[in-house]
């Protein structure tokens, strides 16, 4: 897990929390980048990153102690040919480590939701604290969909801490240098560098629900979650959140939640403890070459609406799902259904284009215009976005 932190200064825990991200500087970095550039960023930004230590409770049994769980892994069955004896579950304390960064002088720390969501105790370790002090924190707000969590310090250090700055994640492009700072394997502050590998990647922090992330090859390992991904100005342009790996360790593919996404939701997390994500209320699939051929489309692009949730904005706006199918060569294909090809006059090639537009540009209560193909005819449909329900 990684956790990052924006600067903070000591305050009273009872102080009213406010948050206003500093203006983003979108100008490209000028001048050459060399080893000195990385050294200077690491030196100037490491102090604003924190280590997060958590404790959580889980129920365990004798099977867990021996690594059992039934089947061929059960030691009683393996060695004695006997069933596992009945054992009352017992509660166990589990410790974990992550990263975070302070985003406001009142003592607000940003990290990943998965770092703290089950925590019964959260402690913060500030870089450079030679006495090894840990400061207790609590969860102020969480957003599982963007894997973001906002912490508030209960205990405060005596000294004022440096403040991290947000950069404009929309300005990042493949090939741009980035730096990650985190707490891999609980080792403490560690710096790695890489480049942006891709932008606009779909990511699924909650099953069936996708969000946009940045992809990087900067080394991220367990303990890094929640830490900052920095551009070459030392500005936070992402929160490191996950890796793609069979082994569970770094394999060259890491993901970060864009800073623009986070800065959008933080004020609402402060006020309400959660963020209401806008919702359309449809299911469907991207148009691929086979589907384009069956539906007699000139190009394999767009998003086919297969089903519309009753009572949803899409339903109220009159969006239509699939009503007819046909089996061709043993595979069932839809023969109708609205095809979304634009949102607010922006082209839609696949579902990720819709989701990214919702994430970047839209909020609950906004009106969104859909450009659709229905029975070969182009038309516009407008709908009012509502809060995504817990389906």
Where are these regions (language model features)?
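Conserved PDZ fold ligand-binding element
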Residues: 109-113, 316-351
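Serine-dependent protease modules
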Residues: 3-301, 306-310, 351-366, 376-380, ...
């Amino acid at each position: 897990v990684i956790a990052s932190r924006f600067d903070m200064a000591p305050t009273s825990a009872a102080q009213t929390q406010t948050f206003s991200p500093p203006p983003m500087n979108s100008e490209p970095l000028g001048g050459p980048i060399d080893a000195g550039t990385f050294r200077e960023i690491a030196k100037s930004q490491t102090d604003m990153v924190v280590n997060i230590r958590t404790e959580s409770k889980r129920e365990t049994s004798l099977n867990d102690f021996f690594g059992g769980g039934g089947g061929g892994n059960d030691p009683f069955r393996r060695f004695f040919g006997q069933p596992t004896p009945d054992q009352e579950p017992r509660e166990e304390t589990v410790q974990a480590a992550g990263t975070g960064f302070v985003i406001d002088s009142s003592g607000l720390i940003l990290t990943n939701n998965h770092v703290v969501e089950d925590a019964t105790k959260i402690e913060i370790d500030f870089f450079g604290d030679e006495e090894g002090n840990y400061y207790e924190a609590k969860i102020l707000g969480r957003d599982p969909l963007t894997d973001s969590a906002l912490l508030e310090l209960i205990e405060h250090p005596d000294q004022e801490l440096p403040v991290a700055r947000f950069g404009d994640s929309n300005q990042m492009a493949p090939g741009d240098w980035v730096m990650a700072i985190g707490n891999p394997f609980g080792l403490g502050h560690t710096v790695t560098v890489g480049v942006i590998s891709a932008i606009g990647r779909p990511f699924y922090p909650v099953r069936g629900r996708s969000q946009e992330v940045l992809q990087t090859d900067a080394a991220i390992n367990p303990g890094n979650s929640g830490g900052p991904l920095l551009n070459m100005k030392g500005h936070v342009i992402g929160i490191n959140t996950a890796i793609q790996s069979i082994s569970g360790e770094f394999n060259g593919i890491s993901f970060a939640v864009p800073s623009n996404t986070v800065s959008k939701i933080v004020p609402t997390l402060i006020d309400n403890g959660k963020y209401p994500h806008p919702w359309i209320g449809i299911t469907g699939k991207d148009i691929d070459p086979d589907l384009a051929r069956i539906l007699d489309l000139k190009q394999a692009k767009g998003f086919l609406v297969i089903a519309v949730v009753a009572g949803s904005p899409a339903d109220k706006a009159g969006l239509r799902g699939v009503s007819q199918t046909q089996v061709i060569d043993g595979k069932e294909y839809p023969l109708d259904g609205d095809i979304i090809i634009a949102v607010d006059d922006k082209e839609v090639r696949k579902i990720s284009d819709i989701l990214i537009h919702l994430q970047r540009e839209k909020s609950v209560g906004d009106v969104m215009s859909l450009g659709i193909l229905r029975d070969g005819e182009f038309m516009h449909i407008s709908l009012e976005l509502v809060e995504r329900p817990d389906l």
